[in-house]
Regions:
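N-terminal glycine/serine-rich phosphate-binding loop of ATP-dependent small-molecule kinases
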Residues: 1-46, 71, 98-99, 145, ...
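Carbohydrate-associated surface elements
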Residues: 52
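A short, polar/charged loop-to-alpha-helix boundary motif
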Residues: 55-59
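Metal-dependent DNA phosphodiester-chemistry modules and their immediately adjacent helices/loops
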Residues: 62
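FAD-binding glycine-rich core of flavoenzymes that anchor FAD
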Residues: 65-69
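Gly/Ser/Thr-rich active-site cleft segment
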Residues: 70-173
Length: 173
């Protein structure tokens, strides 16, 4: 994940050199997976992509995680959803000890550019993690806790365009 972000930074720097009058940097993207970040906002994991199918495989004699979620929480959560990946990683001790939260790769890019320590995820990407109530615009914390997720790990969510910080004197949103 860090290499992806470093390449994006190199491209951004190239364009900022070429177009020095740019005043603001607007980030956009899709939820292509999750990365884990530590208390300093550093990436401490690979990018677990939306193609991660581990949540739909049978684990020994147990039903697939996606079916367990459907039965216990009465919600549909596809295997590629970020929180399905996170639950799988928790249950298989795959979350790094230094990790404190997770976010999308583009949210990590924003953190990397601005030095932000805690992820801020737009509601459209938060919904792509799964376990998200689109009417209340928040994660379904009770259901996540039932599945063994520490809700303090959840990234902050915004519904509008928020300032993340600055990069080379330019506002990053």
């Amino acid at each position: 994940a860090k290499e992806i972000v470093e390449r994006a930074v190199n491209l951004l720097d190239y364009f900022l050199e070429k177009y020095p009058h740019v005043e603001r940097i607007g980030l956009t993207g899709q939820m292509h997976g999750i990365v884990y970040v530590d208390k300093e906002g550093n990436c401490v994991s690979p990018l677990y992509t939306w193609q991660d199918a581990r949540g739909s495989i049978c684990d020994g004699d147990q039903i697939p995680l996606t079916e367990e979620i459907r039965e216990r929480c009465q919600i549909h959560a596809a295997s590629g959803y970020g929180l399905v990946t996170h639950i799988y990683n928790i249950r298989h001790n795959l979350v790094q000890d230094s990790a404190l939260s997770f976010c999308t790769i583009m949210d990590y890019f924003g953190m990397y550019l601005t030095g932000r320590k805690k992820p801020l995820v737009h509601v459209s990407n938060a919904a792509s993690f799964g376990f998200f109530d689109s009417h209340k615009m928040c994660f379904e914390k009770e259901k996540l806790a039932e599945m063994g997720v520490d809700v303090n790990w959840l990234p902050d969510v915004c519904t509008g365009i928020e300032k993340l910080g600055t990069y080379r004197g330019r506002t990053v949103t």
